[in-house]
Amino acid sequence: MKKRQSGVLMHISSLPGAYGIGSFGQSAYDFVDFLVRTKQRYWQILPLGATSYGDSPYQSFSAFAGNTHFIDLDILVEQGLLEASDLEGVDFGSDASEVDYAKIYYARRPLLEKAVKRFFEVGDVKDFEKFAQDNQSWLELFAEYMAIKEYFDNLAWTEWPDADARARKASALESYREQLADKLVYHRVTQYFFFQQWLKLKAYANDNHIEIVGDMPIYVAEDSSDMWANPHLFKTDVNGKATCIAGCPPDEFSVTGQLWGNPIYDWEAMDKDGYKWWIERLRESFKIYDIVRIDHFRGFESYWEIPAGSDTAAPGEWVKGPGYKLFAAVKEELGELNIIAEDLGFMTDEVIELRERTGFPGMKILQFAFNPEDESIDSPHLAPANSVMYTGTHDNNTVLGWYRNEIDDATREYMARYTNRKEYETVVHAMLRTVFSSVSFMAIATMQDLLELDEAARMNFPSTLGGNWSWRMTEDQLTPAVEEGLLDLTTIYRRINENLVDLKK
């Protein structure tokens, strides 16, 4: 993993296409071709999990299941599972530059239900049965959870009126399996569609020497099959409800901190069974990704624990995490893994020591590097080779939005001097050039920055609800000039993927 190369951060949902959201269809294959032509090595994406009401890929109904929004409908037509006429007149949203999650949910569900029904008439049922058998440990749990959740008007399991269902009593589960058999089939088969399409796309990328950098949230949602099945692995009360939740302490950016709301792991309980759940989670992740970025890595050293019911993150306290014991157990079971540690935020010597002991590369965000009054740990001149340098991530503004709206004149002047920006050079190009010229072995540009887009293209604004995760690229934005610019930076700063082969005809 440590050869000097580069890549692009572009989530699946942001790919162009006709059906309201990016998918595993032709535009995804075209994006791989774009990466090949520009001599990249890495395609970084956000988590692929099934998203909840806020549309965040970091709040999923399962740590293992995939987001069925990404199933490509044209592929289902090619497979005979849908008719082209089924897609005519369906309202997937009217703006090609953003995702309307409510519209695509209501538009896609009946289409996928139709495809599932048709699958048992014309599909490869034996292949599906093998998939179901191979993934039984999480698939049955997820299908049961979603079926019962839908039966109870999509309430989280902690709010279900049936106490026996909440407690997973065998008799209750058996009754719901019979009563909701069609829903169980729907969720099993759509997961099959998801993984069948994704693994084919990943194979195409890998065949062309492009590696997929996936993303793993450290926490799971309370409204998830994982917590429903394993309340003993979380800090909960007798009813299975979280007694404390995750977040970040107050800092210079937020006087009340960040209140994420995820349940906190009971690390003592996980330690007793040898971290089996984490080992399985990582094992499954490396079946679908080549490299995994683990979000909020510092939480493994110590994490901010907030009493459940708090209005802000301020009442929390730091609590020690599992430290190296977790990664030692993972290494013993799975061997060396290509992991990137998202080590942003409040850093201590202990967190740095843990990251260095694991050997995982950390992250550097160039937008954080420019402080005219003081040193920044994100400064390129301080970055070790074993790091990943970004213009920004999904949680940052675009470079153009940041430059215009988030920094003062003194910082703009310092940034111009530091990057040696020329009069004829755009701000975004100067930042991209600085990232690609850094010593970090991996340089990652966001697609929005390659397109030099403003704050309207920002992916997420942390600690806000609504309006996030919706940006999409349109087909006309990826011009030859954009391609040439990326290839030029990649060539000048010796980040060319030398393993590339000619695209298959």
From Swiss-Prot:
Localization terms from the record: Cytoplasm
GO molecular function, one term: 4-alpha-glucanotransferase activity
Database matches in Pfam families: Glyco_hydro_77
GO BP terms in the entry: carbohydrate metabolic process
SUPFAM superfamilies the UniProt entry points to: (Trans)glycosidases (SSF51445)
GO cellular component, as recorded: cytoplasm
Gene3D superfamilies: Glycosidases
InterPro entries: Glyco_hydro_77, Glycoside_hydrolase_SF
Keyword set, alphabetical order: Carbohydrate metabolism, Cytoplasm, Glycosyltransferase, Transferase
Catalytic activity: Transfers a segment of a (1->4)-alpha-D-glucan to a new position in an acceptor, which may be glucose or a (1->4)-alpha-D-glucan
EC number(s) on file: 2.4.1.25
Primary location class: cytoplasm
Family assignment from sequence similarity: Belongs to the disproportionating enzyme family.
Entry protein name: 4-alpha-glucanotransferase
Organism: Streptococcus pneumoniae serotype 4 (strain ATCC BAA-334 / TIGR4)
